[in-house]
């Protein structure tokens, strides 16, 4: 692969446009580096449909903030380009981690075409905030060692080999993004592989003041979502790890077993 097509060779130049992962919503779950970028910014273009305004508290007085909720790509790039040309510090603030359903590659491409340097600061994605809220581990020894992050096909299609039915056959821990409005279809597909009585959960607005975590069985998932009137900003979580409590944990990692030797313990 030609790395020049996926990397910005000028990303280390002073004053690049900074793509920042805002985290799942709690202003304190942004990274220290992301917080610093906001504090130093002159312009913040934030994904207003998903990033809570509470994140903007890290900006200094006088920083211009623009919600991109109603903007298209050309408008967003135009704002960044104009501010950069004036020597301003520009932050593009995305929800969660920018690399996951953030549509940042097309923005980076547009900046690169204009010889505008950029850099990316990662963030905490909602799947990990959901695990923290539920008190679970996605990769329990001998239960599941794989985590799938995916979405249902909607207006944005997914590759045929990545459709939910194909992925569900692995019966791994799975977190489904951007698909709560398709919960009826999702539940039917998941039941075919995981079974009707498989444990699942819906994580709504994780880490935010109105967070809700709802546990259910797959056979009840669709109706539960309707009863709770959840229509957006929610994850669907499924997997055997949701059915293991502390009292019934039989399989433990070798890492902390007394007789397990490794480079730091013999």
Named regions from a protein language model:
Residues 2, 12-124, 129, 222, ...:
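Class I S-adenosyl-L-methionine
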Residues 16-17, 75, 86-90, 146, ...:
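A contiguous loop/helix-start segment that scaffolds small-molecule binding in enzyme catalytic cores
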Residues 26, 97-170, 212-215:
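Class I SAM-dependent methyltransferase SAM-binding "motif I" and its flanking Rossmann-like core
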Residues 35, 57, 82, 138-140, ...:
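Short secondary-structure boundary/capping segments
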Residues 57-58, 133-134, 189:
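Residue-level signal for well-ordered alpha-helical positions
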